[in-house]
Protein backbone atom coordinates (compact mmCIF):
# COMPACT_ATOMS: atom_id res chain seq x y z
CA UNK A 1 0.00 0.00 0.00
CA UNK A 2 1.31 3.39 -0.98
CA UNK A 3 1.78 6.03 1.71
CA UNK A 4 -0.48 9.06 1.64
CA UNK A 5 1.15 12.41 0.81
CA UNK A 6 0.27 13.70 4.29
CA UNK A 7 2.12 10.78 5.90
CA UNK A 8 5.14 11.40 3.69
CA UNK A 9 5.14 15.07 4.62
CA UNK A 10 5.26 14.15 8.32
CA UNK A 11 8.11 11.74 7.59
CA UNK A 12 9.95 14.45 5.68
CA UNK A 13 9.54 16.99 8.46
CA UNK A 14 10.81 14.50 11.02
CA UNK A 15 13.82 13.64 8.90
CA UNK A 16 14.66 17.31 8.37
CA UNK A 17 14.44 17.94 12.13
CA UNK A 18 16.74 14.98 12.69
CA UNK A 19 19.19 16.28 10.11
CA UNK A 20 19.13 19.72 11.72
CA UNK A 21 19.70 18.29 15.20
CA UNK A 22 22.76 16.39 13.99
CA UNK A 23 24.18 19.22 11.87
CA UNK A 24 23.66 22.21 14.18
CA UNK A 25 26.40 21.36 16.73
CA UNK A 26 28.90 20.71 13.94
CA UNK A 27 27.97 23.92 12.13
CA UNK A 28 28.24 25.83 15.39
CA UNK A 29 31.73 24.48 15.94
CA UNK A 30 32.78 25.25 12.37
CA UNK A 31 31.54 28.83 12.78
CA UNK A 32 33.49 29.24 16.04
CA UNK A 33 30.31 29.53 18.11
CA UNK A 34 30.51 26.21 19.96
CA UNK A 35 32.96 23.61 21.18
CA UNK A 36 33.83 20.58 19.11
CA UNK A 37 31.06 18.03 19.68
CA UNK A 38 32.62 14.88 21.14
CA UNK A 39 30.28 12.85 18.98
CA UNK A 40 30.88 14.78 15.73
CA UNK A 41 31.75 11.67 13.71
CA UNK A 42 28.61 9.86 14.86
CA UNK A 43 26.52 12.94 14.10
CA UNK A 44 27.93 13.06 10.57
CA UNK A 45 27.27 9.35 10.10
CA UNK A 46 23.68 9.95 11.22
CA UNK A 47 23.45 12.69 8.60
CA UNK A 48 24.46 10.17 5.93
CA UNK A 49 21.60 7.90 6.96
CA UNK A 50 19.08 10.74 6.94
CA UNK A 51 20.29 11.95 3.54
CA UNK A 52 19.76 8.47 2.12
CA UNK A 53 16.27 8.17 3.62
CA UNK A 54 15.03 11.73 3.09
CA UNK A 55 14.04 11.45 -0.59
CA UNK A 56 11.23 9.11 0.47
CA UNK A 57 9.47 12.10 2.02
CA UNK A 58 9.49 14.14 -1.18
CA UNK A 59 7.25 11.93 -3.26
CA UNK A 60 5.22 13.63 -5.97
CA UNK A 61 2.20 15.39 -4.52
CA UNK A 62 3.79 16.36 -1.23
CA UNK A 63 5.18 19.65 -2.52
CA UNK A 64 1.72 21.22 -2.83
CA UNK A 65 0.49 20.33 0.65
CA UNK A 66 -0.05 23.10 3.20
CA UNK A 67 3.01 23.47 5.44
CA UNK A 68 5.22 21.66 2.94
CA UNK A 69 7.74 24.55 2.99
CA UNK A 70 8.61 23.61 -0.59
CA UNK A 71 8.65 25.84 -3.65
CA UNK A 72 6.21 23.61 -5.53
CA UNK A 73 6.97 25.07 -8.96
CA UNK A 74 10.73 24.56 -8.56
CA UNK A 75 10.33 21.08 -7.12
CA UNK A 76 8.04 19.95 -9.91
CA UNK A 77 10.26 21.26 -12.68
CA UNK A 78 13.56 20.18 -11.15
CA UNK A 79 12.81 17.03 -9.19
CA UNK A 80 15.79 15.18 -10.71
CA UNK A 81 18.09 18.02 -9.63
CA UNK A 82 16.54 17.86 -6.18
CA UNK A 83 17.25 14.14 -5.84
CA UNK A 84 20.82 14.72 -7.01
CA UNK A 85 21.11 17.22 -4.17
CA UNK A 86 20.31 14.47 -1.70
CA UNK A 87 23.00 12.27 -3.22
CA UNK A 88 25.43 15.16 -2.83
CA UNK A 89 24.33 15.60 0.78
CA UNK A 90 25.02 11.92 1.50
CA UNK A 91 28.44 12.19 -0.16
CA UNK A 92 29.40 15.36 1.71
CA UNK A 93 28.16 13.90 5.01
CA UNK A 94 30.31 10.82 4.41
CA UNK A 95 33.30 13.13 3.94
CA UNK A 96 32.22 15.02 7.06
CA UNK A 97 32.31 11.82 9.13
CA UNK A 98 35.83 11.06 7.88
CA UNK A 99 36.92 14.64 8.56
CA UNK A 100 35.54 14.47 12.11
CA UNK A 101 37.78 11.46 12.73
CA UNK A 102 40.77 13.28 11.21
CA UNK A 103 40.58 16.25 13.57
CA UNK A 104 39.12 19.69 14.21
CA UNK A 105 40.76 21.47 11.28
CA UNK A 106 39.61 18.85 8.79
CA UNK A 107 36.12 18.97 10.27
CA UNK A 108 35.91 22.75 9.92
CA UNK A 109 37.02 22.61 6.29
CA UNK A 110 34.58 19.87 5.36
CA UNK A 111 31.75 21.50 7.29
CA UNK A 112 32.04 24.47 4.95
CA UNK A 113 31.62 22.20 1.92
CA UNK A 114 28.72 20.34 3.52
CA UNK A 115 27.03 23.61 4.43
CA UNK A 116 27.24 24.77 0.80
CA UNK A 117 25.26 21.71 -0.29
CA UNK A 118 22.58 22.46 2.31
CA UNK A 119 22.40 26.11 1.33
CA UNK A 120 22.18 25.46 -2.41
CA UNK A 121 19.22 23.14 -1.99
CA UNK A 122 17.44 25.44 0.45
CA UNK A 123 17.86 28.41 -1.87
CA UNK A 124 16.43 26.49 -4.81
CA UNK A 125 13.65 24.50 -3.18
CA UNK A 126 12.67 25.80 0.28
CA UNK A 127 10.01 28.45 0.75
CA UNK A 128 11.04 31.49 2.74
Swiss-Prot record:
PROSITE patterns linked to this entry: CYTCII
GO biological process, one term: electron transport chain
PTM note: Binds 1 heme c group covalently per subunit.
GO cellular component: periplasmic space
Keywords tagged on the record: Electron transport, Heme, Iron, Metal-binding, Transport
GO terms for MF: electron transfer activity; heme binding; iron ion binding
Pfam families for the chain: Cytochrom_C_2 (PF01322)
Keyword Transport among record annotations: yes
Binding site for heme c: 13, 17, 69-70, 118, 121-122
Gene3D superfamilies: Cytochrome c/b562
Role noted for this protein: Cytochrome c' is the most widely occurring bacterial c-type cytochrome. Cytochromes c' are high-spin proteins and the heme has no sixth ligand. Their exact function is not known.
Protein name: Cytochrome c'
Annotated source species: Magnetospirillum fulvum
Amino acid sequence: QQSKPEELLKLRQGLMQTLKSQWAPIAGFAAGKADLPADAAQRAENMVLVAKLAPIGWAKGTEALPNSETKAEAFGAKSAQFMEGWKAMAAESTKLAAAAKAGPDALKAQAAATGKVCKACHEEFKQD
